[in-house]
């Protein structure tokens, strides 16, 4: 039988404690997000699955895979396509493919003509999304958990289940964040 040094056992125990803490925090964050989202947990799972299925369907088209950059976001069965395509034909084909995926009820095709953005722009988009989410979180005009934010090449896209007043407020808040070039909304309005 192999003997373990006391130092190795101690280090392993400490590392495992860190893993447990990270797992607990991660699980709590996911649980909180699921609980505050106005969609049912089932709908949230369906939307996540739909995003994967649409992305997979798009990647099966070799020309789309090689020549475009397309990100997929789903909210209550509505699919948002953002990114870049060298021509409108590929953009239209991407929309057609997305519509053919089971579970898709509507497609918002916001793919822009142009060359795919680079890593620097994509990183900046992530930063813009973080800033928009932070502003929505601190606003008393919008329930931030009702709004899904994605950014592509400085353009912010907002989806969600909101009142008209919340939708206008969310768009206004996003438009005031530095680095935002344009705000596009695709809300489902509730009374």
Swiss-Prot record:
A single Gene Ontology CC term: cell outer membrane
Task of the protein: Plays an important role in maintaining outer membrane integrity. Contributes to virulence.
Annotated Pfam families: BON
Lipidated positions per record (S-diacylglycerol cysteine): 19
Domain called BON: residue spans: 46-115, 124-191
Membrane topology: Lipid-anchor
Record InterPro entries: BON_dom (IPR007055), Lipoprotein_DolP (IPR051686), Transpt-assoc_nodulatn_dom_bac (IPR014004)
Family indicated by similarity: Belongs to the lipoprotein DolP family.
Localization terms from the record: Cell outer membrane
Protein's name in the database: Outer membrane lipoprotein DolP
